Amino acid sequence: MARPTDPIRALLTSPPDLPVVEVLPELRERLSPNPSGSDGVGACLVLTAPPGTGKTTLVPPLLADVLTKRTATGPTTGAPDGKSPGRGPGRVIVTQPRRIAARAAARHLADLLGEEVGGNVGFAVRGERRAGPATRIEIVTAGILLRRLQRDPELAGIDAVILDEVHERSLEGDLLLALLTDARTALREDLTLVAMSATLDADRLCRILGSTSGGASPLVEVPGRLHPLAEVWAPPGRTGRLGPRGVPREFLTHVAATVERALAEHSGDLLAFLPGAREVDDVVARLRGAAREGVDVLPLHGRLPASEQDSALTPSPAGRRRVVVSTNVAESSLTVPGVRVVVDSTLAREPRLDVARFMSGLVTVGVSRAAGVQRAGRAGREGPGVVYRCCSPTDWARSPLAPTPEILSADLTGAALELAVWGVPDGAGLAWLDEPPAAALAAAREALERLGLADTDGVTPLGRVVAGLPAGVREARALLETAPVLGARRAARATALLTADLRAPGGDLTTLARQVRSGGPGSGAWKTEARRLEHACQRAASDRLADPEAMGTAALSDGAGGGDPGTGHSEPARSGDLEMAVALVAGTAQPQWIARRRGPAPQAGKEAHYASVAGTGLRLPAGSALAESEWLAVAGVDLTSGRGDALIRAAAPLDEETALELAGAWLAEEERTVWDGGRLRTERVRRLGAITLSATPGPPPGPQEAADAVVARVRAQGADTGLAVLPWDEEARSLRARLALLHEHLGEPWPDVSDAALADRAEEWLAPAVMSLAGRAGGSGGLAGSISPGSGNRRFSLELLDIAEALRALLPWPQAAHLDELVPERIEVPSGSQVRVHYTAGADAAQIGQTGRPVLAVRVQECFGWATTPRIVQGRVAVQLHLLSPARRPVAVTDDLASFWEQGYPQVRAEMRGRYPKHSWPEDPWNTPATRGTGRRR
């Protein structure tokens, strides 16, 4: 039989030996149209397949072939009139989560077809596209397809979309799935949708895709070829995987040593997983320094030029071994041939959002078990393999089952803008694998409104322009905002330093600017990114000519020193221009991260700490040249689990004037009350968000200000510790204890004086007392007796507050008149003395207000003849008697006097009469007169 002339059909006729081949007939049947070929309804299908089974290699050609036959027997899809000018039939878009995976998949498939990329198979990633009118399979990143979908919700000219590696749960991937299913339901029921996943809950995915056609989508499962995989545990000993500043260098030394060990113990190529590009480059440098004979050590991460990425994916010459040190880009969506050994650091870097501070960044965490299984599986694709895990079995057992989907943990500002452009700002009605968290989405929408990209009516004209630019929301807006000042080219060059995925040495963007401008590492990627952004800026200028409102305050015009952005002509960048420009762009992109150093510059090799406008603490890497700068425009941070501050990864120095201008929305002046050593004073404060710029003494606090401040302090510190700051003297303690006793035994209307109740009712009892104190110096707000000598600012002192008098405001009327009757301050004893009742005996500051036994401490001689124990609170509570020696030391404790005289007193008399012979110790205390003095011995 003659080989088909169509290279795609030829590939399917003689496919490579891959597990997915077993299900190709079933896939063809489920994806083929009805016999009539004109029902106009595309198929929806979910395919699950382990990594390495060939789904990315053979499913797109199969679908392209099926669609070619469908368009040959029925109307051409993707166009309302059945026509699709300028292309061949059967156009398939395949999404990949990463640029490197999209390029690699396109190159591999084109090689199988015997073609160059750009023919039947093409790709499109940020800044690069190789595809033409005849391209039938185009492999793109999710972000590329998302922008196409927003421009054309009908996706005219596209017959099918394959969402690959859905299990990775990227934010753009989840958003794209939701919008595609919405578009298919409303506009393109003929669009074929296929979701391919390795580990995801397939039933849930089937329900979501099936929701576009009223039922669950079919599921096709590809069996994997399982080769034996051995596990070796390689914990780092005393060195932890994570420290307070991220991944310790000692742990990277351990990973490199584990790679050396694995090379010595096993044959074949080795793939090592590290959490990020910094760690990859560190371990690569260590391994290359070891200079093992016949071994090529290659890095693999998204920051590398495409040529270096290709080298890592290309087998080494015969007789040489490869060690590929990679981030998670090689976890599932890339094939690294020849690998028989995997060394897994068991760490991953994931995006996180702190909603309370609206601080987003990357966090290094322990890898999930699902991701760890994916990593290990790379060693068993071609034969028996082994995985070395750099953790203990106990740590592995504690690992989460699956990684957290980005939509549940990342900054949703970009997603919120996409939803606003789509017309559903809250995402309601869309089919989500996981709905966006309400708090994070609300914070994102608030950020969009602050940036002028959205309002209560939805997306603004400026927001629509920003959404169409190939950059993050904040960076795209900064490009448009700074172009009038810098010129389009200079603004694009500065913005490219933030978007080109380059590493700033010591977190210093100005050092990076000098590095790339002089042709150093990263210069090629920077120039490519800058050209791309400049062209985007020019297109935005053209849009402005058609709709000036669309540019808002960012209307592009000739900028100082920047030339005409519309023509792209500008003056060559002068020395220092790029450094100044990147500070302006970074501060415009992230004004809430503008920061001022805390204290003086640190000693050499130490970390410098900064306070940001948003209130989050920031720190520079130790030894960073930026530590001399008081003000910084921060563009990127890493978050460390368990730490409240964030590590600055990209920043540029600012002067104070520019900082105040860029973050002007946070500039405010206020008069506030502050505490100073237990005293209250006022000051006039000028601040930039959470950064205090200046504070000058203000007038004495007025009565209401003082009351509000005291009440706020009590509540802010918690009921127990807050009340402890008040000046509780013995009278106040006693009154509170008396009221607590009444509330416990008689209930309402006697007040609850527990910590929580007093804090809750502070406006009723505490505030009036504070206002009275604050107003006693003549009604001007001055405070008699609370002026510090030599101070120009009179201050309110809590020490002058009469807490007992304040508590009396809680006494109920008319019951207050019976207070001393129910819980008397003093009780008359037989000697005629009025002895104080101790209602707080044994209580410390933390126990004020807790009910306990009232105590009457009195000398034995004053109680002779007293047979009945006194009782209070309408007879409900017996007073506990502490009977004292002449030296006022307790000799007995009782609440039953009759029993004491009969049983306890004889022993006390025997012990005391010799020690205190001048005092009365009668044999018959019942009939002996009580006395305050010594009396006569009997």
PLM regions and their residue ranges:
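P-loop NTPase motor module signature
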Residues: 1-474, 478, 551-557, 561-570, ...
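Acidic, serine/threonine- and proline-rich low-complexity intrinsically disordered segments
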Residues: 454, 489-609, 614-617, 630-826, ...
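C-terminal accessory/binding modules appended to enzymatic or scaffolding proteins
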Residues: 805-871, 876-877
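Charge-dense polyanion-binding interfaces
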Residues: 162-163, 295-297, 303-305, 309, ...
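Extended active-site and interfacial segments that coordinate phosphate-rich ligands
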Residues: 152-167, 174-177, 345-349, 358, ...
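Generic recognition of stable, solvent-exposed alpha-helical segments in well-folded globular domains
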Residues: 22, 26, 54, 58, ...
